[in-house]
Amino acid sequence: MVSLEEILTQTKNTEFNNQYKTNMPSRLRMATLYGIAALNGNARISCNGNFSERLAGYFTLWGDGAGDFAPLAHLFVDEVVQLGIDLGLPKDLCVKAPSDGMSGKTDEDNLGFTYDELKKVYLGNTEEIAEEKIVKIQNRIKEYKGAIIGACAHYG
């Protein structure tokens, strides 16, 4: 078996791409949170992603997309913002450009469309959206992260 130290030594001179640099901190954070939860007995981890992010596949598998429960999973981004305002959270926390906090770009910069446009396409309200953007959004919705993980057939 190869040790973690050997693997890291072999990759020392590797140029890590932006996707790796963006996703790895989220995965390490989640592994750390689950480690802390294990040390604290019955602790559970909350996945705080929302429906817009899930629909666009804009989350890190085994990172911010993981958790034991997901209280915001059925809310679009605008509904999460309104919930925060209704709960009295600081406005600067609730009303800001969505960002992964790691790439230096907004979600809209990375996706090429807004969450409002995503919601409109999903709900069929596309009158004000250019056809090429509608197609881009529909294709994004159909990508692999939106699919249910398949189970292997059991033979025997």
Labelled PLM ranges:
Residues 1-4, 9-24, 34, 38-44, ...:
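ATP/NTP-dependent adenylation/nucleotidyl-transfer catalytic domains that generate, transfer
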Residues 26-29:
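Active-site glycine-rich loop that binds ribose-phosphate moieties when present
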